Amino acid sequence: MDCPLENVLDLIKYFRKEWPVVSDSERTTIYGADNMLLTLQLALAEVNKQNGKEFSASLSDVLLTWKCLVKHKLGLAYEDTAVPENYADIRKTYELFLKTSNSLDLIDIYEKISTLGSSEPHNFTSEQLLEFLTEDECFSGDKDFPVVSTPCKNNFDVVKVKATLKRIFLAYLNLLVNSKNDFALAQVLNCPERGLGREAFTDLKHTSRMKNMSLFLVATSFIRTIELGGKGYAPSESDPLRKHLKGLSLFVHFVDRLNEVLGETNDPRTAGELLLSTIKMHLIKGRSSGDPLSEAATDVAQDLDLRIKNLINLLSEDKYSVTPGISPARPKIHAINRGTASGGREMIKTLLKLLDEEAANPPSKNKADLLCADEENTLFGAVSLFTLFRSPEQKNGSSPKPLSHRVQKAMDKNKPKLKQNLIRSQFACTYKDGNLAQIKQWDFPSLSQVPTCIHPAPRIAPVLCFDEEPLENSDLQKQELKLSSGNIDLKTGGQVKNKPCKNVANKRSKRKQVDIQSETTNAQENEPPQKKAVVEITSKKENKPCVTRNCNKSSSKNKLIAGQAKLTSFFRV
């Protein structure tokens, strides 16, 4: 019996030969058995999340759904075969993921080849493909890394590290061939560490679904818009991808660098060597030459380089041996648009050949190790795909805060709030207190402009004073102003007309009355100790005038102009 691996390779080769008939794109990639199983796990977890459950899928459910899916797609399932719960939604999600990634699985390849009705004989049946995908006891395991005769922990770790590094190298090459492959991008988005963890991948995934674009196209368009779009086309400040601008920029620029190597190098052998060397140096940057990871990356790069050169030799032999329907005057590649139109085309074909060989590998023996990867064990920043596609928990604020916080908040709410005394103007007695509440917020746009005082003066309550008697004539007003002036000449002043002191005090205006009260109440607090003039108490009799010189001198010192007492007490603080 023929080897199933060779039959799968022949099936894929025929698909590449007839791709214009069976596929929409030449760069359509193929999912192998392991990638099919991982994609089904993601589809099952996504359906569980849509039904109100957690984003999770048990190993038994995945394996049961896997066998059911393979049988139904190959048409080998019986009518009364029991199907898992929500099987229709799981299969729909699985096929949608393949379609958006511009990819096909092995069963899709078999179905498309079967519908062609080719005259070429194909001995590979659906039963053999079912056995190849579900029963792997007849296969000897990993052909690239032989099993060590004396098992030990260190050798097992080296084999596991090499397998992970090989997956990272192939994912970068897959992304160069098919930029729509979200499965490949998820494996290398944070390899090496770029700060693009689960949160960044979740934001990228949500934006991709909203815009109906691939993950790589979303990241590329975001970086290009910021770099080349200008202010008018720049993303909004609320864009969730702005938080990951640095990491996305590093990732996009590195892929651009790989595309430049692919397009500017005409020799496919040199291009393959440069691609693998660039990826290797990017992964081991900052590590010493004797580091185990550096040595493992070097070994994987050399192995892939040797395989690429062997594939190039096979392609060149096939081209020169069989050339039907090709004109002998066929132009060379470098003669078309100076070698830029078809630059890298030969290398793309070689990379497709390499990826097809990987897709034809038999499934892994240890399904638990494949599906249940260690979340804490990350190599070069890579995490398991299931962990990456699971959205991080969002804080919705529905859970109550701790009891101590709530008690402290209630106590702070009941505490009386201290209000700062307002410094009122000297004319505040002429306005109503209700006007103070109408102060607008933009009167003090910043805290630095708010008037402050270390020891504010006490608030003065306005007192309404009314004149008991009107002034008899204007001469009395002029005389009163002369007595309160500080520039009066005492030697030539003469005597004052007979006027009772009580009547003069009662006939002062309302503003002067308030200033005198403020001076008498705050004299001890705001004024420094000084020599105080003795104020003589006038008698109640109207016939006793204040005509002495000492009385005129003391009254001239004590009497101030309107508002002077308030300003003096304010600036003495």
From Swiss-Prot:
Cellular component GO terms held in the UniProt record: chromatin; cytoplasm; nucleus
Family: Belongs to the PARI family.
Compartment(s) of residence: Cytoplasm; Nucleus
Positions of region (Disordered): 492-532
Lineage per the UniProt record: Eukaryota, Metazoa, Chordata, Craniata, Vertebrata
Function: Required to suppress inappropriate homologous recombination, thereby playing a central role DNA repair and in the maintenance of genomic stability.
Organism domain of life: Eukaryota
Polar residues bias (residue ranges): 515-527
Main location: cytoplasm
A Gene Ontology biological process term: negative regulation of double-strand break repair via homologous recombination
Source species: Xenopus tropicalis (Western clawed frog)
One Gene Ontology molecular-function label: DNA binding
InterPro entries given in the database record: P-loop_NTPase (IPR027417), PARPBP (IPR038932)
UniProtKB keywords: Cytoplasm, DNA damage, DNA repair, DNA-binding, Nucleus
Entry keyword annotation includes DNA damage: yes
Coiled coil: none
Name of this protein: PCNA-interacting partner
